[in-house]
């Protein structure tokens, strides 16, 4: 039975204040985080350098298909409900209802996880600090950034993402110099000595096909957040033009960042290194990024990466609060949630949905 489109009409109370640069950085910021900075070492350790690289490329290709499909729908029907609205309109209202509430719940819980992660990160500098106070502080920051306006959220996310992108570019640049022997830390045998790590032990495909499938979940987690473009399309300027452009740019940037970063790590650190298997936010010294920077002689590499990871956690929580708030607002507009959550203040912020999510 066809869905009643009147219930899925595009909300008009939100303001279209997100520019093209905001869209690109929102998606990049949602995808480059602890999955790359910390968990990437585990993928190399479990599947070998070749297996990890192949896993990121395969999942990246899947994300490309997802992004182009979502981008096409978002450009045609730019609403904050994104795929939940599309599901209700083109499949079934029950499908859209389930999709929307599951997505809201997913991000609402993820915000709590990010707050716990922030506690662990801050424990690096303040081991005796009160974790509850740190969580309350960061929750207040996330709430404030989302309560100002959508433009305020976009600007904050833009600079959060810029820090992470700069770190990845710097890491790749330093890593290439180490591989070429220009900067210390590479193989003493020279350039080809680094490539010998790909034939060490069971490399390049340690663990075979089962290991490749096993790390796919870690890789999939790393790409989580690219769908935020669909959510943000409902508040973007000229979505018919900016959304397709952002989708094309974001996919290639994210894929290249991940592929080159994994390649650099695998050419400088043996996949048998026990540090790679660790995946602990409470000990940033085991991050493959930290290990490479320390080998290059960068002083206080652990402290720098800890700050970057903190930025990643705040960025993820900030994006999650935005996405879940807009989803709850759209559900209310479609009469799939209490109508009180459809209230929008004069700055274009769905405050009741924001309070409920917080």
State the predicted function of each range.
Residues 24, 52-57, 97, 132-137, ...:
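Hydrophobic alpha-helical transmembrane segments
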Residues 1-10, 84-94, 115-135, 167-170, ...:
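Helix-loop-helix connectors at the membrane interface of multi-pass transporters/channels
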Residues 85, 92, 124, 197-202, ...:
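TM-loop-TM module centered on a large, flexible mid-protein loop between adjacent transmembrane helices
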Residues 132-193, 223-224, 247-255:
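Membrane-interface loop-to-helix entry segments
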Residues 68-76, 128, 150-154, 176-187, ...:
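Transmembrane helix-loop junctions in multipass membrane proteins, especially transporters and channels
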């Amino acid at each position: 039975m066809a869905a009643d489109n009147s219930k899925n009409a595009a909300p008009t109370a939100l303001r279209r204040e997100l520019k093209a640069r905001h869209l690109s950085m929102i998606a990049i910021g949602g995808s480059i985080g602890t999955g790359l900075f910390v968990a990437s070492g585990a993928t190399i350790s479990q599947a070998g350098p070749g297996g990890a690289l192949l896993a990121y490329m395969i999942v990246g290709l899947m994300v490309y298909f997802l992004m182009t499909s979502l981008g096409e729908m978002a450009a045609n029907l730019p609403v904050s409900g994104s795929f939940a609205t599309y599901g209700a309109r083109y499949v079934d209202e029950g499908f859209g209802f389930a999709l929307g509430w599951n997505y809201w719940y997913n991000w609402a819980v993820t915000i709590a996880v990010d707050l716990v992660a922030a506690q662990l990160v801050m424990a690096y500098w303040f081991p005796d600090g009160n974790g509850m106070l740190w969580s309350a502080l960061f929750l207040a920051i996330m709430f404030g950034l989302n309560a100002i306006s959508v433009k305020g959220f976009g600007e904050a996310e833009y600079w959060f993402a810029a820090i992470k992108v700069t770190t990845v570019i710097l890491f790749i640049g330093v890593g290439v110099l180490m591989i070429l022997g220009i900067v210390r830390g590479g193989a003493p045998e020279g350039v080809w000595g680094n490539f010998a790590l790909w034939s060490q032990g069971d490399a390049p495909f340690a663990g075979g096909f089962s290991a490749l499938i096993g790390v796919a979940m870690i890789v999939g987690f790393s790409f989580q957040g690219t769908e935020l473009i669909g959510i943000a399309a409902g508040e973007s300027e000229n979505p018919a033009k900016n959304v397709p452009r952002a989708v094309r740019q974001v996919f290639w940037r994210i894929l290249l960042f991940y592929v080159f970063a994994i390649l650099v790590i695998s050419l400088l650190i043996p996949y048998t290194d026990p540090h790679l298997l660790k995946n602990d936010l409470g000990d940033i010294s085991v991050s493959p990024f930290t290990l490479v920077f320390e080998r290059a002689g960068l002083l206080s590499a652990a402290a720098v990466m800890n700050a970057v990871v903190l930025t990643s956690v705040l960025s993820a929580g900030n994006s999650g609060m935005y996405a879940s708030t807009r989803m709850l607002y759209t559900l209310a507009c479609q009469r799939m949630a209490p109508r009180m959550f459809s209230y929008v203040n004069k700055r274009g912020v769905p405050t009741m949905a924001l309070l409920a999510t917080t």
